[in-house]
Amino acid sequence: MTNRWDPGVTRALAEARHGDAFAVLGAHPSTNGRLLRTYHPGAEHVTAVLADGREVPLEAGPEPGLFAGELPAEGRYRLRIGWPGGTQDTADPYAFGPLLSDFDLHLISEGHHLQLADALGANAVEVDGVRGTRFAVWAPNASRVAVVGDFNSWDARRHPMRLRHQAGVWELFVPDVGPGAHYKYQLRGPHGHELPAKADPVARRAELAPGTASIVADPTPHQWSDDGWMATRARRQAHDAPMSIYEIHAGSWLREEGLDLDWDGLADRLIPYVADMGFTHVELMPVTEHPFGGSWGYQPLGLFAPTARFGSPDGFARFVDRCHREGIGVIVDWVPAHFPTDAHGLAHFDGTALYEHADPREGFHRDWNTLIYNHGRREVSGFLIASALEFLQRYHVDGLRVDAVASMLYRDYSRNAGEWVPNIHGGRENYETIAFLRRLNEVVREHAPGAVTIAEESTAWPGVTADVSHGGLGFHYKWNMGWMHDTLHYIGLDPIYRRYHHGELTFSMVYAYSERFVLPISHDEVVHGKGSLLGRMPGDDWQRFANLRAYLGFMFTHPGRKLLFMGCEFGQPTEWNHDAGLPWHLLDDARHRGVQTLVRDLNHLYAQYPALHAHDDDPSGFAWLVGDDAANSVVAFLRKGKRGDAPVLVVINYTPVVQQGYRLGVPQGGLWREVFNSDAGIYGGANLGNGGAVTAEPQSMHGHAQSLPLLLPPLGVIVLAPQG
């Protein structure tokens, strides 16, 4: 019996070091037919059961758990394994041939496998009539990989995998393992050293934190009921359509008795609220799996798995489906820039810098203590793009807000001289990231038609939303960080000093049409000591609420799509805390309820009047009437839609002084209705305004033959539209 086993091989198997288990285990041709070797540490006996029912007891080998015996030259067999606690009847994992096709492996190695989680990861499948799970992981520099889990007592000796050399992929079909099984990969590095057990980078389901295992996902697809939405999505998300985004952190939007809602509970509460408020979209802070809740999801490790914090992957699909049925789009924040250093994650995955750059000047982000993806490696960029498509296709997500784009575009981002590596031309631009982002956006347009990508890009990088064919990055929209910074600084000033900073109010129109913009009042503006949006407003309580209402009125009438973080819509007075729910009890206060009503009305106004959204990206949709009245801190402008759309007049008074008889030219005569007034009593204001309507007078002003004499409420915004 001992001549059936090489001593070096048996030691390597017993020590979980052997890198080519298929060369030893399973049935191999012999002089008497086939020699079957199996390794089941802890087993007391093993019998091979042939297809005709005959049984071949296997003899114990030189190491505990090793068994071998002679089988006929042909025919299938199963194993009957005697354990101390009972008997297991199963197929032999080492009786199956290579699983992934050569074409799959080619696509993986080229970074072009767009359904990557159908090839890699854990897929519950049937092979040769046997049900089980196919495990596959990219680890080209590992000397050995085994899958460990609750199905093999987490024993790295039990299920070593086969290396498919052309792509660096290790694979194994494990019979009888199905959805719900917990697993990880146990790898040895290129020199044989054992690495920390790794979660599956392509797992479609993950264990609830603080657990770090991956879970075999249920392959049953969600039964979607959103055909109507998907058929009209491209129109709903077109550049000339209204887009008002409500950004939320799913774990802290609403807490009941200190507990997070699951996806179904969130859908029950959130969707009716968003619909009532008039938002067109919800934007979820990252829902990909992440180890540390305090990162808010911006340091993810499971880029193919919706986080288990809110339930199952199908629960997330149900949430999206229900949003769509109510006419609400779903955008998710997505992080392809960097990842955390947790030992069970992507860091030094196979004992080398696989997903990250090896040089810390390229591969380590000191601001966040994270590792930076190597976008120049085909397999890594392909991994990220496949993650994007996973959420856009599998979960019908309508858009990705791509996080930290500026940190990817510049090699010297947040680095001093000598701390970064120039590109091949000696410059700071990251050519590899540029190529990655362009390909991402091209792939999204082709394979997720109607979906959008939104860049959080904080610099003046040119052409972020320009077509790739024109040298741009190809995003659909970009956050207008300049507008946000300038206007928040302006509104935070005492009105006495605003006259000296008037340009901060008007400068955004200089570049408003250089990109397709979203105006973001995001979570970033209510954390890290910045306080709340209401807390930034100067003055006493009356002035603070009036300033907030005026600021929101300005935001909703300024060119650009809108994004508002949860809590801002009712004037949350404290900084956001992800460990606590929003202070919904404040809606018992008429002042906060008034802000909420104002935001609801602004959303409906914005959607109702094409002039406020149809030409957000076209200079013909905006005309200054008054942009230089710094002394009174007043601005006035016309918003214009397409031919036949009524114009809208917007007037803003950023002082607490009432302006009487403030005359403004208008492009047509007749009655102009006051369709919005931030000082209305229903919003908590003093009800100062123009009695609901003003009739134009034949007095020329601002290049127009007709003009309106207006009362401008203090710290207020009024919007007028011509009757009929």
Swiss-Prot record:
InterPro entries documented for this protein: A-amylase/branching_C, Branching_enzy, GlgB, GlgB_N, GlgB_N_E_set_prok, Glyco_hydro_13_cat_dom, Glyco_hydro_13_N, Glyco_hydro_b
Superkingdom, natural source: Bacteria
Gene3D superfamilies in the record: Glycosidases, Golgi alpha-mannosidase II, Immunoglobulins
Top EC class, one word: transferase
UniProt name for this protein: 1,4-alpha-glucan branching enzyme GlgB 1
Pfam family, one: Alpha-amylase
Molecular-function GO terms, alphabetical: 1,4-alpha-glucan branching enzyme activity; cation binding; hydrolase activity, hydrolyzing O-glycosyl compounds
Name of the gene encoding the protein in the UniProt record: glgB1
Annotated family: Belongs to the glycosyl hydrolase 13 family. GlgB subfamily.
Pathway where it operates: Glycan biosynthesis; glycogen biosynthesis
Listed EC numbers: 2.4.1.18
Covalent S-S links between cysteines: none
Keywords tagged on the record: Carbohydrate metabolism, Glycogen biosynthesis, Glycogen metabolism, Glycosyltransferase, Transferase
Signal peptide: none
Quaternary state and interactors: Monomer.
SUPFAM superfamilies (alphabetical): (Trans)glycosidases, E set domains, Glycosyl hydrolase domain
Biological-process GO terms, alphabetical: glycogen biosynthetic process
